Amino acid sequence: MNYKLVLIDLDDTLFDYPRTEEAAFRNTFKELGFFVESELGNAKKEEIYEKIKDRYKDVNLQLWKDLEKGAVDKDRLKVVRFEKIIEEFDLKYDPHEMSELYLKKLGEGIFPFEATEKLCEYLHSKYKVGIVTNGIKEVQYSRIENSEIAKYIDKIIISDEVGVNKPDKRIFEYAMNYFEIRDKSQVIMIGDSLGADIKGGQNAGIDTCWVNLRNNVNDTGIIPKYEVRKLEELFEIL
């Protein structure tokens, strides 16, 4: 292998996104006063909250899939997910204000996996390293720049700024152009999403590694060059 550039996803690859999402969602509802004592009682409030959270996760997941397909833009995604739960659960909140508060809380959520910092330090010692993410710009910059991995990242590439989302090959071509890499065999994309990271890397003609930390079954027909189930396994590949 003759890699010079490692492109790597952020959420569920380097950072634990479910933990980030859970903390941000709960803190948003706390700040909005949802858990203030009422005649419903704490147990009932918690039960309702869990139902709202579960529904939000389903709505949000589908919207991000739609984003990858180009069926929705990110500005709309940020608000419509809250519009849906506000309507379905008859909540008395403004979806735009709720979205802004939630994004602020997301930006405070820094939960790297145990091996993340060591991995980034190792990669930085051998290669140029770029994070490539479809995440929301203000959220991702806040999380990365306030984390211990910031000093090991040469470039943060966010779809908001490039104008296209993974799996569009142009975001990977943008990264290669930034690092002045012409030979595609010198580049590898590492990430947890088969549909965004692996398919995107393949669209761009570069090697790929699927980070399958949750032991998911791959029934997509999208086959990565490598698969790891622990971040530590990347040391053996790279």
Question: What are the roles of these predicted feature ranges?
Answer:
Residues T133:
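Conserved phosphate-coupling serine/threonine residues in phosphotransfer and NTP-handling enzymes
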Residues K126-Y127, G205:
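Glycine-centered short loops/turns at secondary-structure junctions
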Residues A115-K126:
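Catalytic-core regions built around general acid/base machinery
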Residues Y127-G130, D183-S185:
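Short beta-strand/loop segments at the ligand-binding rim of alpha/beta enzyme cores
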Residues N2-E114:
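N-terminal helical cap/lid subdomain that shapes the substrate entry/recognition surface
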Residues M1-V6, P18-R19, E121, I136-L238:
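Asp-based, Mg2+/Mn2+-dependent phosphohydrolase catalytic module
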